A protein has these predicted regions:
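Histidine-centered, transition-metal-coordinating active-site segments
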Residues: 1-5, 42-43, 48-57, 61-185
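Acidic/His-rich, divalent-metal-binding segments that scaffold phosphate/diphosphate chemistry
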Residues: 1-36, 49-57, 82
Length: 185
């Protein structure tokens, strides 16, 4: 059985390490911090949740479980040889087994994050005119989603059409993850 609260805590806490301005801000920080060990948003999240709040005598931070901290650190998978400084310091005291895969809850949080940001990026791209909806119809998940919306709601205003279609894309991605996970277990 999976711990839903753990998956949710990992999903929410890992985002604390993101800098302003999204991926552009992160890329800029990586470049600026390269001489000092670089920048990694998951390592930054660990730093924030383990050091920022200083209210208690026995510990700094949010007093999260080892499993939650491990999931935040391994949001993108095992860390490998190049360990960010923020993680290296914390890992000395609390071995997060960074060379192994994260828990199922952490993997669910990571997949959920991927699904969410990919759908938001798709919506942002459509709104900004980077993607034309007609061009996206050839994509395996997107085309059928729009076709279903057009059949069910033939006179839907464009904005609602987009939202309805992307809602179906989102649901299909979630369904694919669930079905693939079930078949792999």
């Amino acid at each position: 059985n999976l711990n839903n609260e753990l998956a949710e805590a990992i999903a929410l806490a890992h985002d604390l390490g993101h800098p302003p301005f999204g991926h552009t801000g992160e890329d800029a920080l990586k470049q600026l911090m390269a001489p000092y060990g670089g920048f990694d948003h998951n390592a930054q999240a660990i730093k924030i949740v383990t050091r920022l709040e200083c209210h208690y005598a026995d510990f700094d931070g949010l007093n999260l479980t080892w499993e939650c901290l491990e999931g935040i650190a391994k949001h993108n998978g095992p860390i490998g040889d190049k360990l960010p400084f923020a993680l290296a310091d914390y890992n000395i005291e609390h071995d997060l087994e960074l060379d192994t895969h994260a828990s199922a809850e952490a993997q669910i949080a990571a997949l959920s994050d991927d699904i969410a940001y990919n759908n938001h990026d798709l919506h942002d791209g459509i709104r900004a005119g980077v993607f034309l909806e007609e061009e996206l119809m050839v994509l395996p998940i997107v085309g059928p989603a729009y076709a279903e919306v057009d059949e069910k709601y033939p006179n839907l205003e464009p904005s609602r059409r987009t939202h309805e279609a992307l809602r179906r894309v989102f649901a299909q991605m979630v369904s694919d993850v669930v079905l693939t996970s079930k078949s792999n277990l």
